[in-house]
């Protein structure tokens, strides 16, 4: 966990990936820092302080989800994104709202398990190598000493058998030591070995996921695990690949799942972040049965956000200290259309602004994972160096902004569509091009995009 970041440091980290939206960054930075502050309080006071949930308001593609996702990744907190429209009111067929908490715990278990695997990696690899040695130099089958009843009485061939076994053991030990040295030196990496691996089987209960049956809070497959032994199958792999498979199996054996579960539930309860997208779609005044159902979903979400206990296969999970971040465009509705009780549970309101041409320019070049850097890296694998002139980047940004204005505003996602269209021919012919360096100019951008961008009807379908 990295809860020690100051709010300013958190904003600086988010700036590496997200352009603008200072208010949203400040809100999540303060929320994260308050978790650190809360952890330093006396226990009686700590229990009284719950996180202040955040409501983000802004059009699609401006960074609502990315702010929350990067925030969670920054501190290593369990994080899930759910869509409010996927849930149904209790009594209807569909996912119940408690499933979001169960999904959060599953994510937390996966994170903790991965951390534990890293800790036991060296020991697991050592044991995997030992298994490889035994596979490469197998033990001979011991002769049974009970073939002849007379031998049991008089010890007929027992001494000679023991002598033979002893000699074989010495020879095998020498061979294994030799193989062990070769393995350590990496001389046997391409050797093919036959190993037994646990077969991954899909459960028939997977069909029940998403139908409301998961509300029982348990995994049927786990419950029946003791009655349904795991199947194994033989696989022929190179020593290099077999080592990975065996290391993973040994790591799973070395991990204490009780410890994993305990830590995972703690992290989900104290550090978990649930991002509820499209919350505006379940807001609205009651006018028909559909709206009544939407209000029912809001009322079902309310106790989860307020703080309650949710049954999971890992035990009961308290939601009192989970941070909820809700988001929506609110084009057809207003935050005040949410039921008053739910409004009160999201005291921090943040409005994200629409992206300007200047924002698009920055998005294209400034973040660590900037789009232009991605395309340059992809084409570099074909031996082609491409560069974009400043004027070309400005032209791309202007076209993206204009298409957003003329059609649906999908924010920064428009850049993905435009960049794909711009470099479509280049990407197709890259493996056949003999030029080592190509410069993208405003004229090239104009040639590829301007005609489409100016034709509103065409741009609706292509850009």
Curated annotation (Swiss-Prot):
It is found in: Cytoplasm. One of its GO terms (biological process) is proteolysis involved in protein catabolic process. Transmembrane segments: none annotated. The keyword Nucleotide-binding applies. ATP binds at residues 19, 61-66, 277, 341, 413. The keyword Nucleotide-binding applies. GO terms for molecular function: ATP binding; ATP hydrolysis activity; peptidase activity; proteasome-activating activity. Pfam families: AAA, AAA_2, ClpB_D2-small. InterPro entries: AAA+_ATPase, ATP-dep_Clp_protease_ClpX, ATPase_AAA_core, Clp_ATPase_C, HslU, P-loop_NTPase. It comes from the Bacteria. SUPFAM superfamilies: P-loop containing nucleoside triphosphate hydrolases. Keywords: ATP-binding, Chaperone, Cytoplasm, Nucleotide-binding. One of its GO terms (cellular component) is HslUV protease complex. SMART domains: AAA, ClpB_D2-small. ATPase subunit of a proteasome-like degradation complex; this subunit has chaperone activity. The binding of ATP and its subsequent hydrolysis by HslU are essential for unfolding of protein substrates subsequently hydrolyzed by HslV. HslU recognizes the N-terminal part of its protein substrates and unfolds these before they are guided to HslV for hydrolysis. Belongs to the ClpX chaperone family. HslU subfamily. A double ring-shaped homohexamer of HslV is capped on each side by a ring-shaped HslU homohexamer. The assembly of the HslU/HslV complex is dependent on binding of ATP. This is ATP-dependent protease ATPase subunit HslU. It comes from Bacillus cereus (strain 03BB102). The gene is hslU.
């Amino acid at each position: 966990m990295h809860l020690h970041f100051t709010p300013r440091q958190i904003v600086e980290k988010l700036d590496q990936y997200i352009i603008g939206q200072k208010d949203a960054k400040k809100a999540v930075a303060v929320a994260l820092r308050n978790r650190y502050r809360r952890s330093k309080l006396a226990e009686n006071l700590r229990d009284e302080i719950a996180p202040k949930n955040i409501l983000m308001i802004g059009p699609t593609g401006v960074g609502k989800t990315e702010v929350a996702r990067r925030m969670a990744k920054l501190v290593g907190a369990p994080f899930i994104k759910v869509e409010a429209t996927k849930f149904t009111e209790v009594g209807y067929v569909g996912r119940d709202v408690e499933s979001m908490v169960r999904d959060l715990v599953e994510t937390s278990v996966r994170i903790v398990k991965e951390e534990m695997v890293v800790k036991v990696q060296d020991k697991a690899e050592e044991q995997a190598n030992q298994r490889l040695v035994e596979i490469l130099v197998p033990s001979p089958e011991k002769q049974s000493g009970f073939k002849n009843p007379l031998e049991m009485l008089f010890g007929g061939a027992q001494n000679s058998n023991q002598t033979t076994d002893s000699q074989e053991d010495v020879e095998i030990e020498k061979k294994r030591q030799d193989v062990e040295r070769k393995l350590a030196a990496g001389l046997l990496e391409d050797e093919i070995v036959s190993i037994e691996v646990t077969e991954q089987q899909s459960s028939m209960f997977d069909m029940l996921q998403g139908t409301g049956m998961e509300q029982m809070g348990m995994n049927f497959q786990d419950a029946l695990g003791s009655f349904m032994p795991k199947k194994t199958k033989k696989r022929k792999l190179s020593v290099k690949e077999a080592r990975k498979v065996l290391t993973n199996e040994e790591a799973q054996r070395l991990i204490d799942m009780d410890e994993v579960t305990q830590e995972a539930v703690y992290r989900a309860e104290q550090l978990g972040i649930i991002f509820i997208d499209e919350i505006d779609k379940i807001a609205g005044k009651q006018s028909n049965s559909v709206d009544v159902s939407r209000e029912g979903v809001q009322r079902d979400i309310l106790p989860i956000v307020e703080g309650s206990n949710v049954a999971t296969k890992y035990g009961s999970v308290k939601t009192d200290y989970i941070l909820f971040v809700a988001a929506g465009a609110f084009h057809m509705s207003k935050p005040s259309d949410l039921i008053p009780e739910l409004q009160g549970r999201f005291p921090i309101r943040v409005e994200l602004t629409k992206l300007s041409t200047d924002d698009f320019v920055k998005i294209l070049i400034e973040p660590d994972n900037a789009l232009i850097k991605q395309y340059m890296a992809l084409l570099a694998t074909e031996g082609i160096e491409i560069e974009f002139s400043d004027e070309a980047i400005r032209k791309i940004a202007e076209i993206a902004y204009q298409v957003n204005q003329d059609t649906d505003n999908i924010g920064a996602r428009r850049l993905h569509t435009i960049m794909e269209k711009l470099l479509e021919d280049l990407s197709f012919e890259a493996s056949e091009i003999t030029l080592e360096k190509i410069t993208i100019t405003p004229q090239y951008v104009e040639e590829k995009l301007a005609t489409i961008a100016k034709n509103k009807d065409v741009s609706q379908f292509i850009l």
